[in-house]
């Protein structure tokens, strides 16, 4: 009996061990559940579990409320949600001038650095010289984060500390209208309106593609002799209208022939090229000329008291090609006779020489081998990129030179215009920026005119004009190197 009981118990135990816990195969409609991830919504105590960013919003789409559960901070939630909802609006760095971008839903917000405002921090709230010249009529400089305006000789700052008001009847850098015009302190009555000029459209010019061959001496032909036969002249352009080129001076030799140009700086001083002083032993300076074959009553010839040539002038390279003439008698400013303004160095280089164009004038030849022009001509020429200028030239372009002109249009300075003015207009006032120096031919394709860069010599010019003409002690001055020469008297 006992043996039978043990047998029954053993069979029962073995049967329980050998019976499977469940079916090995599941029905088709239940098989997909084996690898299915359990959702939080279906998990135990869902609402009391701490939020998880990956589980809530990356593994599946989440709501703003679910994102808020993750961060438990309104600012962090908003920052995440703005990117999560529609992408990062700050990805393109829309905020300018070091502004900080904050992403939003379908938008962004810029926090601007000090001194800037606007949707993209694009507007400056402070005046700077690089933005509209700081609002200044003429010279602009920045001191202690503030703009300081100043004016050329013959002007004073207006009550607004921005405008420049003339204190002279014929202020520098202004076109003259003649005797009938009224004189007043306001500069608008002292000059022709610029809209009356027939300028080329600067928008059609490319400083690096349109180049002009403004030349002094033709470097590929024999150098100029005593008669000045190889000096530079204007090709193309147009006649200077009444009062348009009042700062033009003409150097005239003993044969009463013009051989070089010059720029009137004030009643006693005229700026020209150093190489012009090698073209004639004796010469006078004529001002007021618009037609050398007609007398209009404004012409006047002045004898030269002293010539001041830069002592570092190099005849072979035309480096330091600059000279100043002091006249024996003062120039009387009148119709067609007025000075051009001298700029400040930094302002000239940052503002004037970054303009699109300048103006050159003279009585030069009308083409490379043509006759001299009897009428004063002017030509608007674009500034040329320095690297383009250097690549186009067969000769060295030194730091004391710059290029201007066209490479395709048949317009240029040519033989006879050497030493003449290159001026740049800024707000209807004209400032001296260059001296016609040299070039390769006249209006040759792909060649540029080369000018003396006046901004490099402004201190030198200033010291020359402040010195007494007969001051022997000024000769060889270290700060104003120059060769002082008193020309022989002209024959009666």
UniProtKB/Swiss-Prot annotation:
The active site is at 275 (charge relay system), 321 (charge relay system), 418 (charge relay system). Residues 1-23 form the signal peptide. Residues 24-40, 183-233, 476-492 form a propeptide. The modification (3R)-3-hydroxyaspartate is found at residue 103. Residues 41-85 form the Gla domain. The modification Sulfotyrosine is found at residue 200. CDD domains: EGF_CA, Tryp_SPc. The modification 4-carboxyglutamate is found at residues 46-47, 54, 56, 59-60, 65-66, 69, 72, 75, 79. It catalyses: Selective cleavage of Arg-|-Thr and then Arg-|-Ile bonds in prothrombin to form thrombin. The keyword Cytoplasm does not apply. Glycans are attached at residues 208, 218, 485. Residues 86-122, 125-165 form the EGF-like domain. GO terms for biological process: blood coagulation; proteolysis. Its EC number is 3.4.21.6. InterPro entries: Coagulation_fac-like_Gla_dom (IPR017857), EGF-like_Ca-bd_dom (IPR001881), EGF-like_dom (IPR000742), EGF-type_Asp/Asn_hydroxyl_site (IPR000152), EGF_Ca-bd_CS (IPR018097), GLA-like_dom_SF (IPR035972), GLA_domain (IPR000294), Pept_S1A_FX (IPR012224). It is found in: Secreted. Residues 234-466 form the Peptidase S1 domain. Keywords: Blood coagulation, Calcium, Cleavage on pair of basic residues, Disulfide bond, EGF-like domain, Gamma-carboxyglutamic acid, Glycoprotein, Hemostasis, Hydrolase, Hydroxylation, Protease, Repeat, Secreted, Serine protease, Signal, Sulfation, Zymogen. One of its GO terms (molecular function) is serine-type endopeptidase activity. Residues 472-492 are annotated as: Disordered. Inhibited by SERPINA5. Belongs to the peptidase S1 family. Factor Xa is a vitamin K-dependent glycoprotein that converts prothrombin to thrombin in the presence of factor Va, calcium and phospholipid during blood clotting. Factor Xa activates pro-inflammatory and pro-fibrotic signaling pathways in a protease-activated receptor (PAR)-dependent manner. Calcium also binds, with stronger affinity to another site, beyond the GLA domain. The two chains are formed from a single-chain precursor by the excision of two Arg residues and are held together by 1 or more disulfide bonds. Forms a heterodimer with SERPINA5. Interacts (activated) with guianensin, an anticoagulant protein from Simulium guianense saliva. Interacts (activated) with simukunin, an anticoagulant protein from Simulium vittatum saliva. This is Coagulation factor X. It comes from Bos taurus (Bovine). The lineage of its organism: Eukaryota, Metazoa, Chordata, Craniata, Vertebrata. The gene is F10.
């Amino acid at each position: 009996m006992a043996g039978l009981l043990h047998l029954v118990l053993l069979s029962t135990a073995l049967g329980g061990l050998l019976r499977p816990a469940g079916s090995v195969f599941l029905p088709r409609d239940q098989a997909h559940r084996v690898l299915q991830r359990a959702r939080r919504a279906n998990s135990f105590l869902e609402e009391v579990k701490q939020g998880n960013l990956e589980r809530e919003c990356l593994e599946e789409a989440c709501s703003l409320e679910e994102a808020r559960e993750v961060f438990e901070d309104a600012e962090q939630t908003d920052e995440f949600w703005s990117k999560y909802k529609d992408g990062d609006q700050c990805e393109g760095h829309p905020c300018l001038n070091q502004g900080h971008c904050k992403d939003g839903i379908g938008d962004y917000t810029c926090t601007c650095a000090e001194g800037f405002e606007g949707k993209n921090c694009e507007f400056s709230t402070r005046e700077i010289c690089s933005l509209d010249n700081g609002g200044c009529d003429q010279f602009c400089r920045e001191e202690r984060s503030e703009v300081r305006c100043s004016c050329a000789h013959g002007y004073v700052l207006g009550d607004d500390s921005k405008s420049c008001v003339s204190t002279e009847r014929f202020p520098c850098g202004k076109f003259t209208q003649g005797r009938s015009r009224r004189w007043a302190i306001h500069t608008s009555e002292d000059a022709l309106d610029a809209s009356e000029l027939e300028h080329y459209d600067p928008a059609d010019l490319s400083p690096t593609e349109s180049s002009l061959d403004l030349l002094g001496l033709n470097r590929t032909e024999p150098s100029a002799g005593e008669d000045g036969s190889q000096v530079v002249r204007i090709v193309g352009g147009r006649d200077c209208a009444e009062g348009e080129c009042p700062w033009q001076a003409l150097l005239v030799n003993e044969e009463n022939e013009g051989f070089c140009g010059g720029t009137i700086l004030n009643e006693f001083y005229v700026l020209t090229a150093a190489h012009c002083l090698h073209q004639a032993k004796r010469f006078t300076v004529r001002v007021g000329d618009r037609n050398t074959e007609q007398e209009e009553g404004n012409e006047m010839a002045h004898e030269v008291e002293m010539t001041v040539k830069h002592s570092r002038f190099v005849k072979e390279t035309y480096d330091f090609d600059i000279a100043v003439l002091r006249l024996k008698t003062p120039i009387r400013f009148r119709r067609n006779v007025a000075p051009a303004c001298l700029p400040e160095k930094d302002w000239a280089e940052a503002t004037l020489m970054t303009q699109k164009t300048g103006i050159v004038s003279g009585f030069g030849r009308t083409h490379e081998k043509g006759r001299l022009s009897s009428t004063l001509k002017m030509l608007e020429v674009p500034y040329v990129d320095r690297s383009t200028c250097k690549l186009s030239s067969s000769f060295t372009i030194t730091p004391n030179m710059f290029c201007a002109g066209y490479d395709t249009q048949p317009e240029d300075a040519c033989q006879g215009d050497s030493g003449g003015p290159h001026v740049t207009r800024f707000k209807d006032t004209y400032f001296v920026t260059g001296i016609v120096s040299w070039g390769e031919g006249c209006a040759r394709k792909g060649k540029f005119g080369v000018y003396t860069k006046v901004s490099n010599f402004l201190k030198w010019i200033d010291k020359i004009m402040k010195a007494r003409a007969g001051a022997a002690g000024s000769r060889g001055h270290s700060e104003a190197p120059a060769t002082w020469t008193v020309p022989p008297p002209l024959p009666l």
